Amino acid sequence: MHAIGLMSGTSLDGVDAAVIETDGERVFGTGRSATLFYEDGLRARLRALLDAAPGLAPDDPELLSLDWLLADRHAEAVAMVASRADVVGFHGQTILHDPDRRRTWQIGDAAHLAHKTRLPVVHDFRSADVAAGGQGAPLAPLFHAALAEALEKPLLVVNIGGVANITWLGPTGEVLACDTGPGNGPLDDWVRLHTGAAFDADGALAAAGRVDQARLTRLMDDPWFARPAPKSLDRLQFSARVAAATEGLSAADGAALLVAFTAAAIAAAPLPAPPRRVLVAGGGRHNAAIMDALRRHFAAPVEPVEAVGWDGDALEAQCFGFLAVRALRGLPLSLPETTGVPAPLAGGRIVRPGPAAE
């Protein structure tokens, strides 16, 4: 089947769209990909909604407005990769993720998206897992396993978006996955606050700073890091701790500390065996300071996923195209080893377009 996957991450920068050909078990090919960047006003509205999400009512007028608007933006992203497609995999925009209270909330009107694209839309990928006691994240490991079938193991795939997560793939088919801690999220927020830029381009600001090891130790001294995998977190989970640890630092030293925090948290993830290779996806792979920090932690080569021919900018969107096909076939989206769900579990909900308007 040909699927179009859509992913809008917690960095709130836009929506990625990508075409993938798959049966939900193997990847036969990939097609066009594109990113539709959100305008500044939409990013600001989403950031405010994310901050308000714990107390938000489902009928909140701003929520309903953004629910519709996000579907419009995602339909525009589909048009950017316009291709023969059988289904759309629509992750939606996460505004709340609290699996310990069995809550996860992704917004975006899937029915409106189905109407706009005239395609079946699979959405709500995480709720079934969370309701069953799983962490609801990460969901990429089965896709990573399909892509990496021919690669040497053990292999570690690291995705650094707003949150960082890993997939560890063993030599006899073992899979382990979890969120590791903050990704680009705290660093982006820091850079925006102190320089006005959207992110630390090439890691230049962090590279100019010095890491205060005592502050880094305090950041890593959080009970969450002692929890066994699988585990997941919300983008804002460490906000108070980060604010306290960075207080009084220069822009460069704060950026350096947050880069070190991201890398140290990834390296602290409990792995069954050391990887022979570390492949990095997500926006973090463009940050030279993060990549250098990871190389100091791992004995294995640390490379962007492009080193094995994967498209790091399209990978997450491709993943949700892959998962959409799995959902259509009733195949599991999560495993005990990836989200902590008690048994392999299917998920996602399907919305089909109604009759076209006259």
UniProtKB/Swiss-Prot annotation:
Alphabetized InterPro entries for the sequence: Anhydro_N_Ac-Mur_kinase, ATPase_NBD
Example GO biological process: amino sugar metabolic process
Gene3D superfamilies assigned to the protein according to its UniProt record, in alphabetical order: 3.30.420.40
Keywords for the protein's UniProt record, in alphabetical order: ATP-binding, Carbohydrate metabolism, Kinase, Nucleotide-binding, Transferase
Protein name: Anhydro-N-acetylmuramic acid kinase
Family listed: Belongs to the anhydro-N-acetylmuramic acid kinase family.
Gene: anmK
Pfam families for this protein: AnmK
EC number(s) per entry: 2.7.1.170
Pathway given in the UniProt record: Amino-sugar metabolism; 1,6-anhydro-N-acetylmuramate degradation; Cell wall biogenesis; peptidoglycan recycling
Keyword Nucleotide-binding: yes
Enzyme class: transferase
Function: Catalyzes the specific phosphorylation of 1,6-anhydro-N-acetylmuramic acid (anhMurNAc) with the simultaneous cleavage of the 1,6-anhydro ring, generating MurNAc-6-P. Is required for the utilization of anhMurNAc either imported from the medium or derived from its own cell wall murein, and thus plays a role in cell wall recycling.
Binding site for ATP: G9, T10, S11, L12, D13, G14, V15, D16
Catalyzed reactions per annotation: 1,6-anhydro-N-acetyl-beta-muramate + ATP + H2O = N-acetyl-D-muramate 6-phosphate + ADP + H(+)
An example Gene Ontology molecular-function term: phosphotransferase activity, alcohol group as acceptor
